[in-house]
């Protein structure tokens, strides 16, 4: 439902009223013509039913400055609010626009005699404007708001059973309960915190009246959110059943709940988080779909002095990333902060403070998009912020900018787990120019890529197994050998929270002795596996693995098993091995790998 906020501004009698109406999907571009006297004309472009719609200029202008502000609705950006200043005599003097991702520069000029106004409705976006104009002035401005509807990914799988929909009232998930059985996922149940902050148990979707394997995935809703679901489904058309599910947050990945048989699917979208689920269920979970909303930057509080008549506020808003930070400082003060931001392929420069020739300049260049600033360490006193140190996602640390601390100085850190700093805001003294306070905007860093599964090599016999891909690397390999070659294998992994994970034995579990290949983890990692396979006594007509040899970034292992020339290589250029899968009985029939890109850090 559309909500109209009345126009704010001058009520002069000869105002000419105008109305762009509310039948639009989004605002896409704003043009503002302004002078020292105020905002003289304004124009809004929209998108309607997926097609662009250019609006007319409202007001008249002559010999003005022009500012444009583009909103990328294709990247789920939308206009949330407008802040402005006006007087009764001159109308709108200054404007600033805020989207769910960033803030425009202040447009125009205002003074102490102006009245401030804000056009905003919590949880809604602007889809149209109305207002009035007179004599080379925009007199007033109002807006139309509507709910920002989530993106829907349709349910994947069958349509057997009852259609269910948990909606989008969740502020964050806390637990996901899944039970798997021989015929697939039996049920799914979600626990979450609603938008009022209440812990809520969602209903069970599926059946609880059979035996199965329970799985629970728990996470902290205040810092963790769901970014994707991978799964498998199989069955006749319209009667498919979900066979396995795996959930991924911005911090960690769940185990595979169920099996990886059938067709693979993925519920995800770049730059978005999952806020709800829907699907079909009866005796089993037939299908699963999701609701998603855009991830939004989080604004920190300012550290330092933020009140008093001698300090002014500044706010850059949030961008895609930071390319360079220049700090101008003397022995006692940081006088100016200059930041080069990344904005859709363009560099946007912002400067705050007093930039003259009586100070030292130091620069810190970031290798964007491969590197992000993740934290700022500084000290604050009763009069200023000084010194500053910047740290990045690659583990780099800048030099210390400034070296003097006052007796009352207190250290502070601007940092949010799993996030990059994508913007700054703060306060400075307009006379001396020195910084008095600093804050940041945080945005989730791009997720590390999901591991790629390379096809297993070997014979056709045995039962399938998969250690999974939720690891950072391989620490140790146990190889069981016999007269016929490789009869068993086991791997020791390390996960993303530095826990050691012991994989299952694959092959003959009764061997008393194994050969071992130790890696100097984390500096050493697996890059390839060579092997061969053949029919041997006891394997019937099936081929089994008879030789394996492992190569790391530092060395090559001995040849395990029979002395045979390799007939296959498991390898992908620029990648490391982080997991294994294959087939086995009382012998090893087949071996495959999961790989991740090698990080330069």
Swiss-Prot record:
Matching InterPro entries: Jacalin-like_lectin_dom, Jacalin-like_lectin_dom_plant, Jacalin-like_lectin_dom_sf
SUPFAM superfamilies, per the entry: Mannose-binding lectins (SSF51101)
Region Disordered, annotated ranges: 1-21
GO function term, MF aspect, one: carbohydrate binding
SMART domains attached to this UniProt entry: Jacalin
Keyword Lipoprotein: no
Residue ranges occupied by any Jacalin-type lectin domain in the UniProt entry: 2-147, 150-294, 297-444, 451-597
Top-level lineage group: Eukaryota
Keywords: Lectin, Repeat
Similarity annotation: Belongs to the jacalin lectin family.
Identification of the protein by name: Jacalin-related lectin 48
Gene: JAL48
